[in-house]
């Protein structure tokens, strides 16, 4: 059984981005979106191009602090699972994270954005928080049917809606 990462949130988190479960590279590095070909950090860099530093080239600690300063948070729908490799289709025996406590950790939380289809399968679970829920295209390199530009446009739309940009 593999265990996921703890939530990366703060009391200032307004939009929580929920993935499914960290891939092998992310688990090994103990970092969200740690695979070098994942589009997550490049999308954020493109949304905030005037940031004082190159977020993609920064240390994980700096990226994490920067993300939190933007009102964003990260977590996954699965706390643990069995899986060989990194593909969501290989996830077996998943254990859901307890999302109910998020409102205490994040009193300003205004919405949940699911990063990809596997995460969005649990939208009914996140809707119980009484917040708007969005499905965003997966930033995974396995999601080759969406171009970077198309993913960027979809992500930007949700961030704009919540005044994060």
Model-found features: residue ranges?
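Short, solvent-exposed loop/turn segments at secondary-structure junctions
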Residues: 22-25, 39, 79-82, 118-121, ...
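Short, surface-exposed acidic-centric catalytic microdomains
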Residues: 25-90
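Residue-level signal for well-ordered alpha-helical scaffold segments within enzymatic catalytic domains
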Residues: 42-46, 101, 105, 157
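Hydrophobic packing residues within well-ordered alpha-helices of enzyme cores
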Residues: 44, 122-123
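Internal catalytic-core helix/loop-beta-alpha segment
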Residues: 69-118
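Structural motif
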Residues: 14-15, 111
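C-terminal capping/extension of enzyme domains
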Residues: 1-14, 35-36, 87-100, 124-165
């Amino acid at each position: 059984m593999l265990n996921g990462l703890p939530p990366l949130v703060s009391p200032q988190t307004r939009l929580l981005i929920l993935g499914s479960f960290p891939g092998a590279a992310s688990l090994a590095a103990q970092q969200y979106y740690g695979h070098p070909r994942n589009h997550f950090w490049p999308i954020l860099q493109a949304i905030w191009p005037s940031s004082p530093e190159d977020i993609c080239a920064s240390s994980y600690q700096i990226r994490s602090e920067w993300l939190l300063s933007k009102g964003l948070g990260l977590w996954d729908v699965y706390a643990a699972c069995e899986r060989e490799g990194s593909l969501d289709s290989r996830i077996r025996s998943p254990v859901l994270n307890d999302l109910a406590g998020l409102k205490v950790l994040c009193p300003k939380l205004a919405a949940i954005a699911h990063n990809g289809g596997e995460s969005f399968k649990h939208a009914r679970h996140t809707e119980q928080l009484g917040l708007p829920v969005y499905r965003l295209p997966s930033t995974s390199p396995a999601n080759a049917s969406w171009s970077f530009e198309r993913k960027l446009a979809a992500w930007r739309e949700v961030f704009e809606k919540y005044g994060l940009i």
